[in-house]
Amino acid sequence: MCLLRHLLPIWVLLGFFFFSTATKSQESSVVYVSGASPEIPISQASPRMGAQSPGPPIVKVVLRQDLNKKILIALIVSSSLLCVTVMFLVYLLLWRYRNMKNSFTGIKRKSDSVKSVTTKPTVHKIDSVRKGTIPVYEYQLLESATNKFSDSNVLSRGGRGCLYRACLDEKSSVTVKKLDGGGETDIEKQFETEVDWLAKIRHQNIVSLLGFCVYRQTSCIVYELMQNGSLESQLHGPSQGSGLTWQLRMKIAVDIARGLEYLHEHCHPPVVHRDLKSSSILLDSDFNAKISDFGFATVLTTQNKNLIHKASEDLLDGKVTDKNDVYSFGVILLELLLGKKSVEKPSSEPESIVTWAVPKLSDRANLPNILDPAIKGTMDLKHLYQVAAVAVLCVQPEPSYRPLITDVLHSLIPLLPVELGGSLRIL
C-alpha cells in the first residue's frame, strides 16, 4: 500500500476507498410521500391534517443500492483508466531516458574515436561565435569541395595561407583560406581576430565572411568566391600582371582606398587594418578588389607593439594610426605602377620597393621607363604623374606628411572612367 501511495495519484486511492466502503453500505432510505409525518405525534396533528389524511400514511421506499452501484462502476472505470495512463506515462519516460542515454554514449564514443570537428578554446572567445551569427562548416565538406585541397583548386598562395576554390554544389562556390601554422598561438589569435572583425564589417570593398572551420590543427575561413585570387598572384604570379590593364589597376587602387576609407572614417571606433599588402587584396570575377586578412586589425585607440612590418614608426615605437594603412596603400600603389614586389631579394640584402622607387619617381622624364612593361604607353602621362605623386606622399617617412585616405581617394577617382566607378568621362 505504501508503494501504491507513491506511484498512484491521490484521486485513484480515493476511488479504491469509496469502492471498499460502498460495498459495505446496503442501507435503504424511506421517503414519505403523503400522510402525516411519522416524526409528528398524532396528538399534535391539526384537524385539517387529519381530514386530508384519513387513512394510514402512504410510504414509498427508495433503496440507495442502485445509485451506489452506478457510482461504484464509474469509480472502477475511471480508476482503471487512470492506472493504465499513469503506467503508460512511466513506461514512456523510462523508454526515452534509456534512448537518450544510449544516444549520448554513442555520440561520445564516436567523437572519441573519430575526433571530427574540434571546438578549440580560442573559438569560444570570438564574440560572433558565442552569439551564433557565424555558420560553422564541417571540415569533411570543405575537403570534399576542394578535392582534398588539391593544387588544381588553388586560387593563390601567400599571405597567411592558401586560397582554394571550393564547389559546395552545382550552384554554390566559395573561397576557402586554409591558414598555415595551425596550432600556433599567434596563428590562432589571428584567426580569432579576423573572424570576429569580418563578422561585424559589411562593405562592398571588404571581403564577405561566410563561415569558418576548425578541425584538429587546421583552421579555415570561408569567404565569398574571389575567382581571380589575390592581387599579389596577379602581379607577381605566372601572368606577371599581363591581365591587369592600366584602367583595371586604377580601379583596384580606388576600390582599396574606398575600403580603407570605410574602416577609418565610417567605423566607430575607427579600425586600422595594420597588415595591408597585395596578398591581402582579393579580386572577384570582375576584378573588384576587396580587403581581407584582418588578423592584425585593431581599433584606432589601441596601441600594440607586436607589428610585423609596415611603416617605419610602427617598428620604432609601436604607435598605431590610420597613417599606417596609408603607408601600406602607397606600397601597393607602387606595385601597381612598377610591377615589382614590395621587397625584392635579388641578393643577400633585400631591397624595399620604397627605397628603390622614390628617388626615381621624382624624375618625370625617366618615369615611363621604370613602369611595369605590361602597362607601358597605355595611359595618359598626366594621370601617371599624378598617381606617382600620390604614391610618394603615402610612403613619406613622417606620418604627419602623409595624406588621409579620403584625400587619396578623391585624387584617384577623377583618373578612373565612369563605367569603372570613377568620374572620368572618355569621349
Swiss-Prot record:
Positions of modified residues (Phosphoserine): 279
SUPFAM superfamilies registered for this protein in UniProt: Protein kinase-like (PK-like)
InterPro entries in alphabetical order: Kinase-like_dom_sf, Prot_kinase_dom, Ser-Thr/Tyr_kinase_cat_dom
E.C. number: 2.7.11.1
Active-site residue list: 275 (proton acceptor)
Reactions listed under catalytic activity: L-seryl-[protein] + ATP = O-phospho-L-seryl-[protein] + ADP + H(+); L-threonyl-[protein] + ATP = O-phospho-L-threonyl-[protein] + ADP + H(+)
Cleavable signal peptide: 1-22
Modified residue annotations for Phosphotyrosine: 223
Cytoplasmic side: 92-427
Listed Pfam families: PK_Tyr_Ser-Thr
Extracellular side: 23-70
Classification via PANTHER family: OS01G0750732 PROTEIN, PROTEIN KINASE DOMAIN-CONTAINING PROTEIN
Similarity section: Belongs to the protein kinase superfamily. Ser/Thr protein kinase family.
Protein name (Swiss-Prot/TrEMBL): Probable receptor-like protein kinase At1g80640
